Regions:
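Pre-Walker A (P-loop) beta-loop-beta motif of ABC nucleotide-binding domains
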Residues: 20-31, 89
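The feature captures the beta-strand-to-loop junction immediately N-terminal to the Walker
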Residues: 33-35
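Helix-to-loop junction immediately C-terminal to a conserved catalytic motif
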Residues: 48
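Conserved coupling/switch loops of ABC nucleotide-binding domains, chiefly the family-specific signature
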Residues: 54-57, 208
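Conserved ABC transporter NBD signature motif
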Residues: 56-67
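ABC ATPase nucleotide-binding domains
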Residues: 74, 78-80, 84, 88-228
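Non-catalytic connector elements of ABC transporters
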Residues: 236, 247-354
Length: 354
């Protein structure tokens, strides 16, 4: 549906977007995820037609809409846009906001407005003014207004960031269902890893203007391509390893990995939930509990290993630990990275032996 080829945007000597290519399929949801200043909003604006690319092209249904010789105006691209400030017209009622971009007779407009108000579960607010409704309600109305002209694509730039935590979670689920119901493709820009993972079919991870990884939420989380990606998406423990004889030596013992991989490995990455922690028997301890954080459904403990390294371990809250408990830590799920921080394929699981 939408394709970007080698897209770039420069502001003088500053490169905001560098050589990015992507393809969005019909009805697909993707998130552009990255830290502040990585170029994700600029990329969205290039797709929307709000910025002209310095290089590269944007195609819609195989027709060029941005490039050296053409720049189709935003209003002719027929994309819906939703921003974090909701951007409702303050002088128009809820129903007039929704009807603003709808073509057709008065009765056709009214029918579409009522259809969308029902879809976002707010038919009772038709006559209200924007200042008379809550932030969550304003965001639902913004979604309804974006959907009203039946757009090809919805572009969302940090749409939930101004809402409190619980409302943000609920609204994210609701809006995803609404957009799926309408069958419209969606691009979400966010710096929130949880938002990207829970909202999207696919995540595009950006850093310093570049696309560093693309994949399903599960692929991005379970198989990060770099150490940076492993830390930016989820919690990660990074531990030093060294090849010795015929195995990879770690704080948990010897790891059985292929020799070619083991000789290149310098860092072991383990997710907090992939550790197994047990009370240590005499002489078996390889760590001491230093901190305990209880958050209801999850207990996270900080463990100082015999190697001097500190790790975070998460698990069930039913077995409570206390500081200075002696523990045995093991893992059978890990990834290996080289000295440059790149993942080594072929080193992703195994067992440790003393």
């Amino acid at each position: 549906m939408i394709e970007c080829r080698n897209l770039a945007k420069n502001y003088g000597t500053l490169t905001a977007v560098s050589d990015i290519s992507l393809h969005l399929r019909e009805q697909e949801f993707i998130s552009i995820l990255g830290p502040s200043g990585c170029g994700k909003s600029t990329l969205l604006r290039l797709i929307a037609g709000l910025e002209v690319p310095s290089a590269g092209q944007v195609f819609l249904q195989d027709k060029e809409i941005s490039g050296k010789k053409i720049s189709l105006p935003p209003e002719r691209r027929k994309f819906g846009m939703i921003f974090q400030d909701f951007a409702l017209f303050p002088h128009l009622s809820v129903e007039d906001n929704i009807a603003f971009g709808v073509n057709g007779s008065a009765s056709e407009k009214q029918q579409r407005v009522q259809e969308l108000l029902k879809l976002v579960s707010l038919p009772q607010l038709a006559k209200k003014m924007p200042h008379q409704i809550s932030g969550g309600e304003q965001q639902r109305i913004a979604v309804a207004r974006a959907l009203a002209p039946r757009p090809r694509l919805i572009l969302m730039d940090e749409p939930f960031s101004n809402l409190d935590y619980q409302l943000r979670q609920q609204l994210r689920r609701d809006i995803r269902e609404i957009l799926k119901h309408e069958g419209v493709a969606t691009i979400l820009v966010t710096h929130d890893q949880v938002e990207a993972i829970t909202f999207s079919d696919r995540v595009l991870l950006m850093r310093d203007g570049k696309l560093v990884q693309s994949g399903t939420p599960e692929e991005i989380y379970q198989h990060p391509q770099t150490l940076w990606a492993s830390s930016f998406v989820g919690e990660a423990n990074h531990l030093s390893v060294e090849w010795q004889a015929s195995a990879l030596n770690s704080a948990f013992g010897l790891l059985n990995v292929p020799e070619a991989i083991g000789k290149e490995a310098r860092i072991l990455m383990v997710r907090p939930e992939d550790f197994v922690v047990e009370s240590a028997t005499d002489g078996e301890s390889n760590g001491i509990v230093k901190t305990v954080d209880f958050s209801g459904s999850v207990q996270t403990i900080g463990v100082e290993l015999n190697s001097g390294e500190t790790i975070q371990v998460s698990g069930s809250p039913h077995l409570l630990w206390t500081p200075e408990d002696s523990v045995t830590i093991t893992t059978e799920r890990y990834l290996c990275f080289d000295s440059a921080g790149n993942r080594l394929n072929g080193c992703s699981s195994g067992s440790a032996s003393k």
